[in-house]
């Protein structure tokens, strides 16, 4: 009976002791992140660094509308194809939209020299001033300026480019011409012209009254002399002749001089360019909408302040960096492992080793206490706030460093530059791969550091409590301490805020420890006596059983016993 009372006393003492546990917050979040060592770690809080959505529309860029070329190409627009007449009045834009394979380009067949370079130049232009460089009515009094072609028809009538003049002979003559323009616009001026290549000598004589024509174009940075190539060619757009198109950029203060005795397609309008580094040319079939955005891709607009996107590598405006990643999520909270709460008489709760606490909602780290006055959770606001500040600063720093928003337009190559285009693609792919690797590695490393940081903070909080309590309490696992003395709410609060008075409770704790140690010793002595008696009794039972079996076997002759003296 005495043994039973001692065991019950020991159990009662352990069950009803005051306790305090250190743990961390948990919630119902299903966010997962990757670290250097683990994949799909469930965490309480995280931030997404990768934008993967767009609106599927073409939008204004910071309130400025794009220039939609419609069914016209850049060549058709800048030369003044009659079918692109509606674009003539457009002089400013946020970016240029060209459809894939537009119908209206160069209406009169021929080669457009350095066309891809011209597109590249225009991709950085946000506005221009279209002005008459050589007025039609006064610049060419000795030449006919009404040359048209059925291949450039408009509304069923033969026409020609709005920005060029096809000069032909007048009154049976084509006098030598010399015309110059001095750039006084204080901007670069884009000048375009052409050279006509007739299909036969008869056509050459009829138009220009000479067989040995030339065209010369000279400026400080450009000098070239063209000779018409008279030859029969396959018909294109019902034309056997060709017009080759040329352009140059005239610096402020520079002069361009045109000399010719035939075959000149003269400039009528030129363009004073204003550069805008946020502009660009994109190929897209996306519809225009009444929306405003900071970033435009061929697939649609992106409205995001995130540092990375995987929507499209070609972007216009202030855009996140393109990476090939499918997921870039940075942890800001803790590992989310809600504990399985085992409830005894006083609802004992597992601590931070086995899992977090969903009941603690006002902080990341904190305490759960239990005494005669009840139980409850309390966050450690100081350590939580320090952690929040540190992680917030880190996330902001990462986003700020990686969030270099910019325009990334595609490079232009002609059909004869396939090797260069392929090399450029390989280089671009290499850069994208490097950016993707750097972004993913950065997130993996920072996630690992953040989770280790949280683990360290919980451990530091545990050590803080342990150093205060010393031998006034014992560690019982799961981040918990069991007091050797009564600890009311005021006492619990002193442990949490670091003002626990160790000497005040040391005597009570000492007596409690001695009492518990005495109970353990007496209980151990009783158990030893019981063990001895149990061993002796079992041995006697075994001997009696063996004797009875031997006697029975001897009596029925199964066992013979001989005693020799």
Curated annotation (Swiss-Prot):
A lipid is attached at residues 554, 561, 564 (S-palmitoyl cysteine). InterPro entries: Capsid_hemagglutn, Hemagglutn_HA1_a/b_dom_sf, Hemagglutn_influenz_A, Hemagglutn_influenz_A/B. Residues 18-528 are extracellular. GO terms for cellular component: host cell plasma membrane; membrane; viral envelope; virion membrane. GO terms for biological process: clathrin-dependent endocytosis of virus by host cell; fusion of virus membrane with host endosome membrane; fusion of virus membrane with host plasma membrane; viral budding from plasma membrane; virion attachment to host cell. The record marks 343-344 as: Cleavage. Palmitoylated. In natural infection, inactive HA is matured into HA1 and HA2 outside the cell by one or more trypsin-like, arginine-specific endoprotease secreted by the bronchial epithelial cells. One identified protease that may be involved in this process is secreted in lungs by club cells. GO terms for molecular function: host cell surface receptor binding. Keywords: Clathrin- and caveolin-independent endocytosis of virus by host, Clathrin-mediated endocytosis of virus by host, Disulfide bond, Fusion of virus membrane with host endosomal membrane, Fusion of virus membrane with host membrane, Glycoprotein, Hemagglutinin, Host cell membrane, Host membrane, Host-virus interaction, Lipoprotein, Membrane, Palmitate, Signal, Transmembrane, Transmembrane helix, Viral attachment to host cell, Viral envelope protein, Viral penetration into host cytoplasm, Virion, Virus endocytosis by host, Virus entry into host cell. The chain crosses the membrane at residues 529-549. SUPFAM superfamilies: Influenza hemagglutinin (stalk), Viral protein domain. It is found in: Virion membrane; Host apical cell membrane. Residues 1-17 form the signal peptide. Glycans are attached at residues 27-28, 40, 71, 104, 142, 176, 303, 497. Residues 550-565 are cytoplasmic. Its main location: virion. Homotrimer of disulfide-linked HA1-HA2. Interacts with human CACNA1C. Binds to sialic acid-containing receptors on the cell surface, bringing about the attachment of the virus particle to the cell. This attachment induces virion internalization either through clathrin-dependent endocytosis or through clathrin- and caveolin-independent pathway. Plays a major role in the determination of host range restriction and virulence. Class I viral fusion protein. Responsible for penetration of the virus into the cell cytoplasm by mediating the fusion of the membrane of the endocytosed virus particle with the endosomal membrane. Major glycoprotein, comprises over 80% of the envelope proteins present in virus particle. Belongs to the influenza viruses hemagglutinin family. This is Hemagglutinin. It comes from Influenza A virus (strain A/Russia:St.Petersburg/8/2006 H1N1). The gene is HA.
